[in-house]
Amino acid sequence: MFLLIMIVNLISDTVTKPSNKMLEAMLSAEVGDDVFKEDPTVNDFEEKVASLFEKEAALFFPSGTMTNQTAIKIHTQPGDQLICDHYSHIFNYEGGGVSFNSGVSCKMIKGNRGRITSSQILESINPPDFYHSPKTSLVCLENTTNKGGGAIYDLNEIEKISNLCKKHGLALHLDGARLWNA
């Protein structure tokens, strides 16, 4: 009798290797220059994601960090403050990009395995008329959480957070690098 032992490394999705089928698909894929919107694979992917999220368009980025940092830059001004969980990827694993790229500070909330609640966010919004504190302009969530061990937000809580952000004029960004896991 033989015993087959298979080792599965779940430390990160970056340690996986493509299967032969995946390699064959990559080698046979139709390609083009995505800069000129000529890559059918990228175009199809962006259209499918936009449709899935009921948005007019989507934009594919080569990395989650680049995506997050671009979103932060778009939604803030230098000197602003964003709200995130203390385990958040944008604070812990993006090389200080929030402050370096956008001149923004982070107000960290101690949530539950990387998830923060609408009530915690409400308590953390700086008073807009108090000029000694930075303007709160953005809330950043991560679903599923990385450092939180893959915890998943309850959809109702995300809706509460979204409504809170709208009420207070805050942008809301969801780091969805592991969204398909949710």
Where are these regions (language model features)?
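N-terminal amphipathic/basic leader segments beginning at the initiator methionine
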Residues: 6-25
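Buried hydrophobic positions in well-ordered alpha/beta secondary-structure cores of metabolic enzymes
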Residues: 10, 49, 67, 98, ...
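Conserved N-terminal alpha-helix of the aminotransferase class I/II PLP-enzyme fold
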Residues: 19-64, 86-87, 91-92, 97
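Conserved core of the PLP fold type I
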Residues: 56-75, 109-110
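Conserved PLP-anchoring active-site segment centered on the Schiff-base-forming lysine
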Residues: 74-92
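Hydrophobic beta-strand scaffold residues
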Residues: 82, 105-106, 172-174
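PLP-dependent aminotransferase-class I/II
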Residues: 102-163
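Catalytic PLP-binding core of fold-type I/II PLP enzymes
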Residues: 151-182
